[in-house]
From Swiss-Prot:
InterPro entries: Alpha-defensin (IPR016327), Alpha-defensin_C (IPR006081), Alpha-defensin_N (IPR002366), Beta/alpha-defensin_C (IPR006080). Coiled coil: none annotated. The lineage of its organism: Eukaryota, Metazoa, Chordata, Craniata, Vertebrata. GO terms for biological process: antibacterial humoral response; antimicrobial humoral immune response mediated by antimicrobial peptide; cellular response to lipopolysaccharide; defense response to fungus; defense response to Gram-negative bacterium; defense response to Gram-positive bacterium; disruption of plasma membrane integrity in another organism; innate immune response in mucosa. This is Neutrophil defensin 3.
């Protein structure tokens, strides 16, 4: 019985440790969405991506000619997700 309680406590600590970074990302996304003006007729697009996923310059000219789009619900075949777009209070996939 005591072993079961200890294992449950360890599991809860591990889950809480994993949930904290996710909460920080959620807070950043919420803050980005709150900054979007609703009365402005211009289109406002907010992009967020992970720099570690960005394509490297190992192939010359790759980044110059690469086309990226914000898509819902996911990237098309042959594209890779590099981050998130926030547009009109919706979350889109940033695909290249």
């Amino acid at each position: 019985m005591r072993t079961l309680v200890i294992l449950a406590a360890i599991l809860l600590v591990a889950l809480q440790a994993q949930a904290e970074p996710l909460q920080a990302r959620t807070d950043e996304a919420t803050a980005a969405q709150e900054q979007i003006p609703t009365d402005n007729p211009e289109v406002v697009v907010s992009l967020a991506w992970d720099e570690s996923l960005a394509p490297k310059d190992s192939v010359p000219g790759l980044r110059k000619n690469m086309a990226c789009y914000c898509r819902i619900p996911a990237c098309l075949a042959g594209e890779r997700r590099y981050g998130t777009c926030f547009y009109r209070r919706r979350v889109w996939a940033f695909c290249c």
